[in-house]
Amino acid sequence: MHGGDYNPEQWLDRPDILEEDIRMMKKAGMNCATLGVFSWSTYEPREGEFHFAWLHDIMDKLYANGIYTILATPSGARPAWLDETYPECRRVDSYGVREHHGVRHNHCMSAPVYRKKVSVIVNKLADEFGNHPGLLMWHISNEYGGECYCENCEKAFRVWLKEKYKTLDALNKAWNTRFWGHTFYEWDEIVLPDLRSEHFEYDRSQFQGITLDYKRFNSESILECYKQEYEAVKSVTPDIPVTTNLMGFFKMLDYKMWAKYMDFISWDNYPANEDSPAMIAMNHELMRGIKGGQPFILMEQTPSVTNWLPYNALKRPGVMRLWSYQAVAHGSDSVMFFQMRRSVGACEK
């Protein structure tokens, strides 16, 4: 597979640009494009009002040129109406402050209304495009991660703890709560470990037992959201493979557990300036290893710069080719990029 992440909704008013993009993709021998990763607000600009004609047009044109679609579900970037109407969808940070609308990947995974609205848009997409001849695979959400410290998450965490430990005596023993007088006598006494309680700095804890269990709970909670979307598209398109893009040595999620619910592994390779070829190789090996050595998909890499580094080193000539060949040598069935056309503004321009 050869292609990359394509966000044509940025140029719907410029059909000449879209036509030129497809011409150049075809000329480059590309055979797939990832669509719709951040398109929820374009699909559903107002609650219950859906617009898919533009995506039909793009998929039709890509398919006519021998380019298949990896169709993403857009749950990683919520529309403004969702946050305005249902503020409980907005994540609460480690200081207890509920975030405003903005950024991406900052929703509360425990909010029932978030899961409900995600289910609506995902089912709409599956019904609308499940039979399209150009549909190659489903790409669920995008780079899952993040933590929320709201009341919904706190209640869900207590339920998770009850299921794991059964009794407070067992929990207190496992966490060694008698030290520093942390012993719990009621389940409702347990609060989330954050910067208001057990944490100091962002990722350091005074009370490791509760922090480790919260991270396990969080990984499973996010996995539940992924599985909800996985099952939704599988119910409509059982023969279309499903994946989500992982992130190498990302500590927040238990990728070994996640691999059980992915038809194949895909991941995004964005080396930091200091990462050696050996470190990149080890990331590839981890991604291949979590699903028994099966080949994986390199879903994203950047031919230019990344948005999260404070500065980016200039790539030496040939480095992009070397990174691509290295991925294939370690078992990747693809060489793919982000983005096919660079944005003219905002974060990832």
What are these regions (language model features)?
Residues 1-2, 29-31, 63-69, 131-136, ...:
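Short, well-ordered coil/turn segments that N-cap beta-strands
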Residues 1-14:
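Boundary/entry segment of secreted carbohydrate-active catalytic domains
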Residues 18-99, 122-126, 228-236:
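Aromatic-lined substrate-binding rim segments of carbohydrate-active enzymes
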Residues 82, 92-94, 155, 340-349:
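Aromatic-rich peripheral "rim/lid" segments of glycoside hydrolase catalytic domains that contact
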Residues 96-264, 268-282:
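Polysaccharide-binding and catalytic clefts of secreted carbohydrate-active enzymes
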Residues 100, 243-349:
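Hydrophobic targeting/anchoring helices
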